[in-house]
Every structure is written in C-alpha cells, then in structure tokens.
Amino acid sequence: MYSSSNSFMGGANSARPGQPPFMQQPSYSQYPPGQPQSQQQTGFPSQPTGYGLQPPQLVGSQLQPQQTGFPGQLQPQFTGFPGAAPQQQQQQQQLGGFQQSVQQPQFTGYPPQNQLLSLQAPSTTGLPTRPAPRTSSEVASSFNDGAGVAPPPPPKSAGSKIPSIRLSFITAQDQAKFEQLFKSAVGDSQTIDGGKAKELLLRSRLPGSELSKIWILSDTTKSGQLFFPEFALAMYLCNLRITGRELPPSLPEKIKNEVSSMVDIISFGVPDTQPEPSRSNVPSFDAPLLENKSAPPAPQQPQPQQPTNAHLLSQLAAQPTGFLPQQTGFQPNQSSFLGPSAGLAPQATGFPGQSQQQYLQTQPTGLMTNPQATGYSGPRPPLPPMPTGFGSNLSPAQTGGASALVAQPTGIPGQWGFVNAPSSGLPNIEALKQQLMPQPGREGGFTTAGLSGNASIPWAITKEEKKIYDDLFRAWDGFHKGFIGGDTAIEIMGQSGLNRQDLERIWTLADPHNRGRLNMDEFAVAMHLIYRKLNGYPVPSRLPPELIPPSTRNLNDSIGTVKSLLSQDAESRKASGAFLQPQKTGVSYLKEHSFRGGARSPGVGRKDATLFKNNDEAAAGYRSSARRRVGNNARAASPATSHTSEEELSVEQLKKKIRETQIMLDAVDFQDENRAEEDEALDRRDRREAESLMDRVRRIQDDIDTHPNATFRNLDNGAEKRSLRRQLQAYEDQVPQVASEVRRIERELAEAKLELFRLKDAKAHPNSASNIVGTGPGGAVTEADRIKARARARMQARAAELAGRPVPASADDDGAAARRLESESTVIRADRERNEAMTRDVEESVREFTRSLEDSFKEGGETSTREHERRRWEDALGVEDVIRDFIYDLKRGSRTAHVRKEEETRTLPTHDHRVRHEDPSIASRPSPAPSAGSVGSAPGATHEDRVAAARERAQRRIAERMAAAGLKPHTDSTETLVQRQEREKREREERLRRAEEEDAKREQERQRRLAEEQRGPAKPAATKPVGKKPPPAPPSRRGRTDSAGQADARPAVEETAATEQAAREQAIREEQQAQEEETKRLEMEAQQREQELLKEKEAQEARLRALEEQVRQGKVRKQEEKRRKEEAERSAKEQEAKLAAQRAELEMARERERQLQLELEGLEDESSSDEEGPVNITPQDSTPTQSQVLPAPSPAAAAPEPELEPPVSPEITSSASSHAAPSSFSPETESKNPYFRITSQAAENQVSSPPPVPQTTITSPKTDVQSTNPFHRLAQQEAAKPAFTAPGPLERKSRVRPEADDDWSAAGSDFDSSDDEDDERPGGGSAKQLASILFGTMAPPRPLSAMDDKSPSKSSTPVQDNTVASPVVPEASASLSAPAAPPPPPPPPPPPASAPMVVPSYDPSTAPPPPPPAPPIAPPAPPPGPPPPPGPPPPPAPPGAAAPAAPAGAADRSALLASIQMGKGLRKVQTNDRSSSSSAGRVLG
C-alpha cells in the first residue's frame, strides 16, 4: 500500500533480496536442476488441513468438491524441464471442497512445460453432492503404497483448557464449581452442546420460559453451544432467578465484554489435533522457503515452524501461483482440466471465509499461453508468454461455482462462533480493532491474552489493515484534528497489553520527527508494529522501507530534491562566478527543475515559484521620475500608465481634463456634503435616543427613590458588611469555648450525679460494701480502707448488741452495690453521650449557619467586574463629561428625594406626640425620659430608625440595671464607624423633626388666623346671642343720643358714621375674641407641658426613691453579711477550740477504748453486756448528728424584702428583681452569676458606717438531701471551709430511737458525723466510734440555752462551701414555706437596736435558694414597728427528710427570753437521766 510498486501488498512479485525475479523461479522438485528425477511411488506428504476430523457443514452456497488433476490413475508425466528427465507426476483424485477448517497452503501451479499432458478424464465443473470428507492423515496415507508403516495414532488431547481468568460477576468458589461441572460434562471438548446444557439447566427447576431467556442471554456466539464463560453466565443467571431477582433484558456491558473476551481467548487458543507428518520420502515442498535463510531479515517473510490455526489464517493471501510456494488454502488440486482440447484456465482460489471483493480473485494455475492477471489486479510488469504444451485455446473459466462464495465462519460450530470469528485472512485483527475502539467500559475487564498469536504477517500493510487502522484513527480523532496526541496514543496503545519498552520503541519508529503526535499514516504504522509484536515478531530497530508512510517518504524526497538542487546551484554559481555578478531579474537557476515538473508541466501557463518576480509596472498609480535608475536602463516615463508625455497634450485636452477634474471634485464635494448630512442626522438621532434614555433613567430613578422600600437600598453597604463579618467571626470564635464549657459542665454533672447516687445508695443500704470510702490514688479502695470498713462493721454490730438492737443484717452482698453503681453509671453515661450528641449537633448547625452567612457575604461581595462597573456608572469614573454630569444630577436628585421622604415619614402630628407622652405605659418605660430613641421608633419611622431605637432602649435598660447594681457598664471605648454614623444621623433627624414640628405649629396658627379673618363679616350674627357680649362703647351711645337729638339736622352723616363705627367695633370685638382664644390655647398648652413635666418629674422621683431604697437595702444586706462573717469567724474559732478539747478527750479515751476492746474480745459470756447495753449506751442523746437535728424553714424568710415594695413601674420592678436576684439565687448558680459578686462589691463601696443591727439570723430552708445526708458532707468535708450559722434557740433533741426518726442507724450516724477529723488513718474511725459510744453519755444533758455552742457537725444547718453545689429548693417546699407568715416589712433606714431585724439567711460563700414569687397584695413599706409576730408551726417537711425541727429564733439567751415573752410555747422535754450508769463502763472479769 505504501510502496509505489506492486510489491508492497504481499504480491508474488515482491522484489525482495534473496528471491529470484519474476519468470526466473527455481524448479520445484525434490532434486536439484540437472539431475534426473526417478519415478516416485509415493504421493504428496500429509499436509495439515485444519480440522479435518470435523464433520462437514456445507450449504448450497459453498463450493462443491471437484476432481482436479489426473483423476483415476497415477501415470508418470514429464514436466518438460530442459535438461531433466521426465518427472513422474502423481496426482491422486482429491476432494477439493471447502471445509469449515483452515486449509494448509498448497502448490497448485506448475512451471512452464514443453510436453503435453494427456488428460483422461475431464473434471466435473458442476456442484454434485459431496462425499464424506477425508482428513489430512487420510490424504497423507493415500500416497503410501501399502508397504509403509501405518501412521501413528493421533495424540491424546489434554482436555478442555479453561483460561485462568477471573470472572467478576461470580465468586471464585462459584467459578471453581462451574469449571469442575463444565469439565465433567464436556470432557475433552471446549464447548458444551445444547442437550447437555439443557440437562444441567433443568436441574434448577426453573420454568421453561425462564430457561429460554437464560439460554438466549448466555449463548453470545449464537452457535448452539456454550463455552465455559457462557456456561458460567448461564449458571449465574439461573442463580439470579432462583434467588428471586429478575433477569435483565440484556446483558450489562461489563459482563458481555468479559464473556466475549474469554470466548475469544478460548477460540484463538485451540491447538491442532492432527499428528506430526510421518517420516517418509515424500519431497519437502518447504525446501524453497528454506533456501532464503541467508537473506537479510528485514524484508524476508519469516515462516513459523509449526503451523497452527492462527498461522494458517494469516497465510491466506492471494498469490500468483506457479512460481514461489503459494498459499491458496486448497488441497493440491489441478483444476480447469476440461478436456484435451481445453487448456488450463484460471480458477478462483483463496479462502472461502472472505468476501469476493477482498481475496477471491482469479489465479493462474498450471499452463497458460497468455499472461493472466491473478491474485493481485494492480499494475505489474508485463509477463512474457509461457509455452505450456497446450494450444492457444485456453480460456479463462471459474470452476466450483465461485459466484456462490459468501463469507462463512470457519472451524467447528461454537469454536469461534458467528460473532467472535474474524472475517479477514489476518487473525485477531478484528479482535484487536474491537479492543482498541473507544467504547464504554473498556477500562474494566478487557484482557489482551486473545490478541497474541504466531501468524505470518508481512511487512507491508494491507488494504484491509489500513482500513481498520484508519477507522480506529477516525474513531479516536473525534474533533477531526488530523492527529492523535500522546495521551490518547498512550491510552490506545496501552490496551494492546505490550510492555512499556516495546511501546516506547514502537512510538519512536512511528514518530520519526519527534512531534509528539501521530497522523493517520503514522498511526497505521504504530498499529501494524503492535499487531506484529502481538503475533511474535520483534520490533525492528529501524523502520523498514515498506512501512515508511507515503507522506513522509514523498516529503523526504522533496526535501532531498530541494537540498540537492540548492547544493548543485551553489556549486554551479561558485564554479561559474555568477554569485559575484549582480542579480538579474528574470533569471532562474531552476528552470529545468521546477516543482511542477518543468516547463512542460500542465501548469506551464502559471508562473512557477522559482520564476516569480513582482511586476511593479502592473501597479497603477503615480511613480516618481526621480526614482532610482537600475543599471543602464533608460529613464522610465513618470506616469506609469501614461504612454505620452504632458507636452504632447493640447490646450483643449488640458481644459477638458481640467473640467473633468472639476466635475470630479464637485462630485466628491457633493458626496462629502451628503455624507456630512447623513452623519448629522445620525448624530441627531443618537442624541434623541440618548436623551430619551436619560429621561427614562430619571423616571426609573424617581420611581426607585419614591418606592416605600427605597430606604433599604443603602443598608447593604461595605462598612456594615465588614462589621457584621467581624461580629460573626467573634461569635464563631466563641463557639469552641462555649462548647468546651458545656462539655466540662456535663462532665461535672455526671460526676455529681454519680456521687449523689453513691450517697443515696449508702443511705438506702448502710451495710453495703459501697460504704467503703477509698483513700488511695484517684479514690481507689485500698486494703487499709477494707480493714477500716470491717472494723467499723464490727463496731456497729457490737454497738447494736450492746444497745439491745438487732444486729444489722448484711444482706446486701458485695456485688450488688457494684451492680447498682454500674447501672447508674450506664444511665449517666448514656445521658452524657446524648447531651454530647446534642452539643455536637448544635456545633455542626452553628458551623453550617456560619458557612451560609459567610457564603452570603461572599455572594454579595463585589467582584472586580462589578466594582469596575459600579465605579464607572455610580461614581462616574472613566465616562464622558455629559454622562458624568448626568450621573451627578441623578445622585443629587436621589439624595434630595431621600431627605424629602424621610422628612415626610418623620412628620408626625403634635397631638399624637402628646398622647404618646401621656400614655402611662410609655411613662413607665425603663427610660428615664422620652428621648430621641423613643420618638424615632414611631410607626412612621424607617426600619433602620426602629432598629436603632430598640437597640438604644435595650442598651439604656442594661446600663440602668447595671448602674443600680453598682456596676460600671461595659462600653466599647472605640466607637465604630457605623455606630457613629447612626448616632449622627439620629441627632440630625431629631433636630429636623423638632424644627418641622415648630414650623407646622406656626403654619397651623397662621392658617387658623387667616381663616378666622376671612369668616369675619358673617360671624357677628351667630356669635352675639351665644358669646359674652362686651358692653357697648361710650362713643356709640353718645352717637346714638346725638343722632336722636339731631335727627333732622344730619341724618345722613350720622347714619354713615354709625355704620362705620359699628363695623369698627365688630372688628375690634372679633380681634379681642381671637386674642382671648389664642391666650386660652397657649395657657392650655403651657398647662399640658407643665403637667407632662410634672409627671415626668414624679416618675423620675419615684425611680430615684426606688433606687435609693434599693441602695439602702443593699447597704443593710452588706452590713448583715459583714456581721455574719464576723460571727462565723468567731464561732469558727470557738469551734476550733472545742474541737481541740474534744480531740484531747478522744486521745484520753483511746487508751480506755483499747483496754475495753481487749476485755470485750476476751469475754466468753456476753449476756452481761447485753443486760447493761440499753442502760449505758446512749449515743443518740450525747452525739446528735445531722440526721437528728434538722433546720426548720423560717416563716420570716419566705418572702425577701425587695418584693415587699409596691410595684411603681415595670422598670422599678425589674430593677428590684435584678437586685434581689443575687440574694435569691441558689448556690449552684452563684458561681455563674457575675452580678452577685459585683453587687456585693458595689454595695460595699456605697455603704457608710451603718447603725448596729441585732445579731439575729434566720436559717434559710434547705432541701432534704442537703440537710439529712451526712455522706454528702463527709465527701466534701476536706474542701469545706468552716462557717457559722446560728442554730435555732428553740431546737429540741429527740429522745426516741433513731429508727423512728429517719431510719438511720445510730452507729452509722455517729460514724458519719465524727469521722471527718482523722479518717485518714485506717484505724482512726474505730477509736472515735468507740469513744463516742462509751463516753457519749458521761456528761449531763446540756441545757437548751447552750445549744448554740455545738460543733459544726452538730449544727442544724450543714456548713457548705461554694465548691459544693446544693440543689435548688423545689417549688413545693417554696410554696409551703411562703405563706407561713405575712411578709415582714423592709427594715427602715435607721433600724432600732431593740427591734430584731428579720432578713433571710445569706451566706457569703453560698447563695440561698431562689425566693418564691412575690405575693399579689403586698403592703407598702410602713414605718418601723414592733417585731413581727411568730408564725404558725412550720409545714411538714418533704418526703425523705427527717422530722422537722422547731423554727429558728434568736441566737442567744436574750432572744430566747424575748420569744418566750411574746408567747412562744415550748415543747415539753423529758430528760432521761442516766448519770448513774454513764460515768464509766463496767470492767468484766
């Protein structure tokens, strides 16, 4: 294809080294030329014919077998070679019909002969029924005379070989099972037929319709047989249907590609089943091929040693027969022997599996007298006549019905199939095309194993190959660029499966110019080299001439020609000295070597490129006469187109020329005028359009300015966006801190809940093993803790025995407490995880919201283009002056309209303004006086003003509350630009509004006066009977009397004067009435203003009084707190002294305890101890614990004093509540509330030296858990600071058993209340317990008046530190304690020393629980009076608490006496005197 001759298409006349030229082929004989050839007894050796053992499957369109050669007999014939003996030609009748197997190349022609051959039987040219075919082994055996050795048996097949390729749609185990089942069913075959497949598929018990669909989908080759991948696909589809899934209407692309690829691999990999040819003396017809082994390897055609199916397919190329060993695909047949008078005619040979347009071309076989165009119909050298012994009566004829040849699949059915088999003589070329075509799914599952082979492929690219490669190129060159880039080429060539080194070498050969891309011809070269490599040929080191593309070869030839011409020209000019002469125009050194083939070329009429010279004369126009003269040429004429000089023109001609020129100039002027008029008209039209557009823009701008929402246009400015972005960033930075704080609080809550459960569990199960308090690292229970717990348990049991109580049963095993703790821990952990998930969700939502806000900021941001447009059309930058003036005019109009609109919206009637000030709800607002912010929030104000006013009110409210609390409001020292602009804008608007209100008032007054003056003449008749008529003026009365007396003299003058006087009087009266009305109106307005100011002043005074009252109360509270602190410090010192004394006593008692313990352990008879136990052991009376002495809720503390004040205004109420909040917060919220500490500091700064207040404190009610759980205090005792809270003076001890009070064991209570000093030691608790048990009743019962000297462990109110968060009092207890007594009045500023001040308990370290809501009817603050009467008995305590104690009263004896004098009743107390037996324990033994 690429060669200019006919030797590059695989023809027979390939002019290659090592081969003789045409008509000079060597003789094809067993003997060399010149030697006699003896008669041979054997025929041709057995030739491989493909699948000779397969049954014939011929249809009517195939060639029927015909008898060729010498039928019926074997007679010696002489071939007529000069100088050689006659050669015995033995041709046995062969059945040359086409089988479905690839035929071995046979030699059907003979060289020229000079002796006639006798033909005894003509060959049948019809299409008779074909007899049974014979295999190649039978053909080989027919040449033996019977004396030879029998052919060896065919080799045993190795069985069906399934490629080790993994199918992706089934598992590896299923594939192994299917392979085993397939091999057991097919044996040595490669396919399973329909019957066996049906038997296997029917085992699935699927309906026939489903199996039919499965067969249709599985039989991809449509051959009625299944390869293994098809069988595996069928089993896979059966499995799909069995599991209930529907069958797909068509196979997915990936599965189809995998199955088809594996079928191709199996099809191309089927080995030959024929045996090796038998060793005999049959001449070797491959000898001529072996003679060219010494030839250069580049153009020679390598021959495979063991021909296979792939080789045979690649060898089926049309060849001229009779010269070199040709490959025709037929058995050795001598066709066209039609009789003695008929010579050998050309017959159609080749391969039946190809179409007639490709390879089915006439071939000269045998003798011919004229050259016959066979095999290749292209131009070729003429062939000389070949005498063959026959006459010239040979005529071409086709035998065997060549017209009925159609493409048929070769091989046995199902081996390649009707789909996967290639349709050309080159094997695997179609598979390679399908592999390399761009198609979906090519990335997955394609294998390249089926593309390799060992076929015989020529160097030259055939037409069919070129067509396939061109189709591939066009398919990949989707944009029709004419080339394929390196990336695409890598993708295409990488699908071939070759290694990278081979592909690099192929690319280097295909891209000789190193352009990095391949055109169509270079791509074909690369594909051909890949195809050769896949078939076992090495990649050449340099590109052979047959593979050089025509475009490259022609271009290289052209470049070489030009280079040679240039070099020859340079040499000739150098030799002749022409390069020293000036260049002469029109001289070409390439006249005989033109690119167009010389002067005789068809394009001789056109000037060649080598002869081109610009013709300056052809250019019309003026040329100066002073132009440079070239050489010796004469001076050219001045006008280039003028052939006559100007002197030769006559005057008339010159005048005519002038007139013509004038006419032309006039015409040009006329055209210019017309063009100017047109331009002017266009300019006028453009101006009109521009003016109309400007008017339209103005109207639209006016509409925008007058729109109600026009105010919101200026809100979205850059400064506000930046401010909002900074705020957003600040909030976003606070999110992690808040989240970590939330997690910390959750962790603390979980730990607190777990600790609370431990305490409750210890209370519910006193004898449980969980009572062991670990003193090891991290709270771990050590062995010393267990020893101490066991000793404590023994002491409790012994104490119970001594007291006569039953021994506490330890029914709770060691694992129950752990299980309960674990279950509670699980619940707490689940709650914590749930809260953690909620926290994460909140964080994620906050992040998403932040991102959305940031995106909105970014979307609203200006890009460079938008900013440029805005600066151009809004700031008038880079535009013309007219447009700039227009833009400035629009901006001025917009500002004016904006100000006018704001003025209109802010103009409010004065009456509405006054009503707004008279509104009591407005007067009770938190703001001290109506300011600009409250006015700006009118309904007519803009959204921006309303937002600013609301923000101002909120800030002012917060500032007032903080000022009332004694705090300095936190204000940002640096005022932002937006805030400053808003403030200035509000001030300006307020000034404008006030000025407009005054103008409106004056205008209304002026209009009213004008209206009254206009109604003047008609008004007297209506106003005389109604209004208060002033007395008539004296001149009028005198005038009347005079006129009556002188009526006759001057009637007309008097009448005229009277009329004028009456008119003047009427005008004066009306003016006086108007003045009176104006005066009254002004007075009313002045009174209204005075009233408004008075109301504002009263409201201000009320607020000031409330604030002063709050400050005074704060001072009182501060004094009380200071007094309580001092008292607590004093009591703490006393307690320390008492504790020191008790420790000394305990030290003295430890020795006694040790002795008694030894005695108790040594006793054998314990009955005596039981007799004395109830009398001697009284631990409950001697050591009252926290569970026995409980605080009682104080009736006076039910309502705190800030809520007793009358609600002056919502602001006062809110302020009071804000000040009362610190005193009503629970201890849990005390650490979180900054106002409490700051309020205390501010009140402390404001307090002067207050008058003394009675030292009376009333304990605040505590919850049952706080007051009755000793374990809580036990766990927190080390961190608690000693504080003092005076117990109630009327508190009584209970003399009953502790089981009747709160079900707490005496030993447990004693242990828990007295184990906080020396519980660090393992045995310390035991000594203390024993001492408290044995010596608790030595001293006589203490009087009630000395109850205030108890230690903190025996006080009615447990001492708590701010680190211990006490729960808030429930609403039920609050509601029970609230109505206990009428709320006491607030203390007066100078409280008397005699009156006991009743204030709620206020611990500086812990805040009390929040107070209940204020009663609905609270009396106003009266002057100081007598002390409040005692309240009723306290309400019952909440469930789970101990018996309530008596209400707390005064802290000393005088307070107790005062309470008794007021009628306080005391409960009768029975004293159980055990002094006789409490002095010492008995020593037994």
UniProtKB/Swiss-Prot annotation:
The keyword Metal-binding does not apply. It is found in: Cell membrane; Endosome membrane; Cytoplasm, Cytoskeleton, Actin patch. InterPro entries: DUF1720, EF-hand-dom_pair, EF_hand_dom, EH_dom, WH2_dom. Residues 645-765, 1054-1172 form a coiled coil. Residues 1-161, 268-309, 323-342, 620-649, 799-871, 895-1485 are annotated as: Disordered. Residues 21-49, 81-107, 921-941, 1189-1201, 1210-1226, 1364-1379, 1442-1451 have a biased composition (Low complexity). It is a peripheral membrane protein. Residues 1161-1173 have a biased composition (Acidic residues). Belongs to the PAN1 family. This is Actin cytoskeleton-regulatory complex protein pan1. The lineage of its organism: Eukaryota, Fungi, Dikarya, Ascomycota, Pezizomycotina.
